[in-house]
Amino acid sequence: MSICSTVGAGLNLHSPANATNSTRLSSNFVHQIPVSSFSFSFQSSSLRLSQTPKFSRQRRNPIVVSSTPVVESTKSSFRAKNPKDTNILVVGSTGYIGNFVVKELVSRGFNVIAIAREKSGIKGRNSKEQASDQLKGANVCFSDVSHLDVLEKSLGDLDVPIDVVVSCLASRTGGIKDSWKIDYEATKNSLVAGRNRGASHFVLLSAICVQKPLLEFQRAKLKFEAELMEAAKEDSGFTYSIVRPTAFFKSLGGQVELVKDGKPYVMFGDGKLCACKPISEQDLASFIADCVLSEDKINQVLPIGGPGKALTPLEQGEILFRLLGKEPNFFKVPIGIMDFAIGVLDFLVKFFPAMEDAAEYGKIGRYYAAESMLILDPETGEYSADKTPSYGKDTLEDFFERVLSEGMAGQELGEQSVF
């Protein structure tokens, strides 16, 4: 028997024994499933930028799906269904992109089951009620994707089949343990649990930077991507779409308020070390939603950027100063400073292992300061703006203009902040 509660109404409703699946998942109610928390621990080794770390102490289990799914699979039929009869499980639903993906899927008429933590958002500051309001229109299931048994129990209590899983999970910090816990383990759990409930398609939000994996979160994402592809290879009735977006608008907006207040625009080197084709959260959410039904996106790795030309940090700063009507004022930081800092941190990690995440954060900052978020052409070994697909209509200039007038509300960087 499922228990639903209307948000803020203080009224509990018990669905009758003969309730249909669509009744149980009616968008008029929010399905709330409390779960207990468990401790989670990882062992990890120190990371060096110049070599691939070894994880010999940490045994990783391959993706295993029970031979007899809990519910009858809908492998050949979900794309022919009416959207309102298609159940889509979204994990990472309260994140920056996940929230927009839920809204987009709901707007297209899909029956969305959004998995959320009881304390979500940046540093867990959002309550269950706030999460439910944020995910309005979806059926919110409070669970813990980092523990497979907890997630499977939550889905079992819902007692409905799953057609598609959409994963928008991503490590908040990029730290070593957090990367493997979220980008690999939790994402794997969502695949296993979804397939055990009949899911026949998996849409993964990955990142374009995994093309050149020098960071721990990139390796974790690539490991899951490989296992996802292998799962589809072994089961012809199971498919995937791997979405690798370029930079998000919010990751480029951290200096808007500073420049508005008269501070210089900070960039590394000459401001031309890297470039990207940034994409808005709404455009990316639309592309991810397209992957649910579009057959031309089945079993594909899909790099995607926003509209317009690729922009270097120098060009991004010039756009910002033009919108403000100010003379450009740049502060150029030699990239060698970051290399020196990383070298010091790597040395300290040998004596103070607890500093390994600090060293990793330095490498993350260095990576984004020098590596382009564009297609890496295997023939030339160079990044190619021309080969990076564009999608959507929102431009970075539009975003900057909006932030200048409205602020960064809803675009907070949290632990991802650099400036």
UniProtKB/Swiss-Prot annotation:
One GO CC term on file: chloroplast
Designated name of the protein: Divinyl chlorophyllide a 8-vinyl-reductase, chloroplastic
Keyword Chloroplast assigned: yes
Record EC number: 1.3.1.75
Keywords per UniProt: Chlorophyll biosynthesis, Chloroplast, NADP, Oxidoreductase, Plastid, Transit peptide
Organism in which the protein naturally occurs: Cucumis sativus
GO terms for MF: 3,8-divinyl protochlorophyllide a 8-vinyl-reductase (NADPH) activity
Transit sequence range: 1-71
Keyword match Transmembrane: no
PANTHER family in the cross-refs: DIVINYL CHLOROPHYLLIDE A 8-VINYL-REDUCTASE, CHLOROPLASTIC (PTHR47378:SF1)
Record localization: Plastid, Chloroplast
Top-rank taxon, per record: Eukaryota
Activity response to pH changes: Optimum pH is 7.0 with DV-Chlidea or DV-Pchlidea as substrate, optimum pH is 6.5 with DV-MPE as substrate.
Thermal dependence of activity, per record: Optimum temperature is 25 degrees Celsius with DV-Chlidea as substrate, Optimum temperature is 20 degrees Celsius with DV-Pchlidea or DV-MPE as substrate.
Chief place of localization: plastid
Known function: Catalyzes the conversion of divinyl chlorophyllide to monovinyl chlorophyllide. Reduces the 8-vinyl group of the tetrapyrrole to an ethyl group using NADPH as the reductant. The best substrate is (3,8-divinyl)-chlorophyllide a (DV-Chlidea). Very low activity with (3,8-divinyl)-protochlorophyllide a (DV-Pchlidea) and (3,8-divinyl)-magnesium-protoporphyrin IX monomethyl ester (DV-MPE). No activity with (3,8-divinyl)-magnesium-protoporphyrin IX (DV-Mg-Proto) and (3,8-divinyl)-chlorophyll a (DV-Chla).
CDD domains: SDR_a5
A single GO BP: chlorophyll biosynthetic process
InterPro entries the record matches: DVR-like, NAD(P)-bd_dom, NAD(P)-bd_dom_sf
